[in-house]
């Protein structure tokens, strides 16, 4: 249901419902950037500069059971790719949107899913974005 997390009658997501789902599924969320600068006043990654990336190594350290990472959006995926390449035992490639790559990094096997951006600036219908997420959450 593409509208599952949308507030009824509104054009926004239901934060409480998302948190409830995340808790039940054992999901954690983080940004790939700790500090950013928007070069223009819009949601486009093209005008987003990462000033301080988040440390994936530090984020994963207290979560030894974490073996799946998901990125949404181009900038987040580019930043994660750079960190994975630095900490991987073999070359890492960018997954196709809606797909995953398996790799060894940070002393564990990881599955990295790259999903379509959830931003309204990304020109893909919510229904098509939901189709990609069905593969991640069968």
Task: Describe every region a protein language model picked out.
Residues 1-48:
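Short, surface-exposed acidic-centric catalytic microdomains
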Residues 40-57, 82-138:
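C-terminal capping/extension of enzyme domains
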Residues 2-12, 77-88:
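Short charge-dense sequence patches
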Residues 34, 76, 119:
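Short, glycine/serine-rich, charged loops/turns that create anion-binding
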Residues 71-77:
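Short, well-ordered beta-to-alpha junction loops that form the rim of enzyme active sites
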Residues 58-62:
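A generic secondary-structure signal
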């Amino acid at each position: 249901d593409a509208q599952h997390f949308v507030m009824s009658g509104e054009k926004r997501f239901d934060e409480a419902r998302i948190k409830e789902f995340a808790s039940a599924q054992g999901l954690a969320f983080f940004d790939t950037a700790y500090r950013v600068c928007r070069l223009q006043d819009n949601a486009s990654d093209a005008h987003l500069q990462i000033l301080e990336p988040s440390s994936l190594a530090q984020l994963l350290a207290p979560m030894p059971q974490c073996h799946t990472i998901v990125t949404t959006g181009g900038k987040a995926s580019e930043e994660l790719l750079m960190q994975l390449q630095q900490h991987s035992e073999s070359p890492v490639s960018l997954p196709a949107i809606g797909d995953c790559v398996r790799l060894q990094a940070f002393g564990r096997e990881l599955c990295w899913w790259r999903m379509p951006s959830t931003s309204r600036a990304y020109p893909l219908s919510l229904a098509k974005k939901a189709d990609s997420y069905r593969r991640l959450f069968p």
